[in-house]
Amino acid sequence: MTPAFRRADLTGFLRTYGAALILLLAAMLAWQPAQAQLRVDISGTGATQYPVAIADFAVDDTHGRALAEVIRADLTRTGQFRLINAAGSGLNVDSQVAHDDWRAKGADFLAYGSITRGPDGRYDVRYRLADTVKKGQLDGVAFSGTEQELRRVAHQIADRIYEKITGVRGVFSTRIAYVLKRGSTYELQVADADGQNPQVALRSREPIISPSWSPDGSRLAYVSFESGKPVVYVHTLATSARIPVANFKGNNSAPAWSPDGSQLAVALTRDGLSQIYIVSAGGGSNMRRITRSPGIDTEPNFTPDGRSIIFTSDRSGGPQIYQTGLDGGDARRLTFNGGYNISPRISPDGSTLLYVARRDGAFRIASLNLSSGSETLLTDGRDDQSPSFAPNGMQVLYAAIQNGRSVLAGVSSDGRVRQTLSVLNGEIREPTWGPFTR
């Protein structure tokens, strides 16, 4: 949780924060729909924009139009596509595509299809993707689903279009988690990657912190406070069952999953100052200490290969980001620009470090190429927090302040395209992007 490094010195914060946790009340578990009103604002374009036309799906006009709108919205949010008007195309899945005509309209690619309702009440969706330059079909697939599942089908089609055109796997079918504050209530919510279909996993009168996805997307680890102190729980989303996995003396915080989902790296104060430990994701009293430093070590994250951990430490004075092996050997410092770098995240391919950097008095999301050492500031807000990579590494999710309120924001990994998702009846905190699940 970023505020751990935002108030006075680190040691003072832990003392203050630890005392405050005693005041926290019990949380109520729930898995139910959340009624959040959303507005998405997008700015900027990618270095490359692919011209693509998305025709309304034929036969069932109402559902076909809605299906195409979701696909268009998914592709638009990336900033990598330029939508070509396909109104009145009259295409269905069996149509012969006039490639030259669509090329003349400026479309290098054309997506089209049909949606029909079967006798069992389910909808059959068939889609095609044409390459108008090469005058051939790039993709074609059929889906089946209930009316409630059609939005998911649209995301799956958008994923296929994105991958066929860019060569990179799409993330529109993935999920995100975040904490939503409404009045005096805090909710841990899970939603589609576009912020729609939010569900409440946990509700509390007191703050919920540090949500973290399991590698298979079935569980969330987080910190909750029913026992009067911070305890790390693992929560199974399908059943709402949960178990405590770090309930040791002192503060238990900052859970992060190992790549195989069997362990969690956590920050514990059981032996004094905050240090990094590894505990079992299945619970139990066993733990293994990783760091032994005279400073405060926190915010651990496994590298994608599972062989080392990156974390934040003030061992050099101000908070910086380090890497150490699981054997707890000497830690290697990774960040040197500026005197304040926290909240590290590593890209899915292990090539790029993401973190919050204080520059000129503002807290911004930065990325560091671990090979070249080149740093890029991705955002220009005054208080940008909690960065999280998309599972394909192409986008970054974070929390930003807009008009005095905390909102969900996104930026492309090169910093060119930005989007803001405003929840009109609450404030979003600590977003985290879920993994690919299929």
Curated annotation (Swiss-Prot):
A Pfam family reported for this protein in Swiss-Prot or TrEMBL: TolB_N
One Gene Ontology cellular component term attached to this UniProt record is: periplasmic space
Residue ranges of the TM segments:
none
Keyword tags: Cell cycle, Cell division, Periplasm, Signal
Q: Name where it's found.
A: Periplasm
BP-aspect Gene Ontology terms: cell division; protein import
Leader sequence segment: 1-36
The lineage's top-level taxon is Bacteria
Task: Provide the assembly information.
Answer: The Tol-Pal system is composed of five core proteins: the inner membrane proteins TolA, TolQ and TolR, the periplasmic protein TolB and the outer membrane protein Pal. They form a network linking the inner and outer membranes and the peptidoglycan layer.
Q: Which PANTHER family match?
A: PROTEIN TOLB, PROTEIN TOLB HOMOLOG
- Family in the record: Belongs to the TolB family.
Q: What does this protein do?
A: Part of the Tol-Pal system, which plays a role in outer membrane invagination during cell division and is important for maintaining outer membrane integrity.
List, alphabetically, the HAMAP family matched. Answer: TolB
Question: Would you tell me the protein name for this molecule?
Answer: Tol-Pal system protein TolB
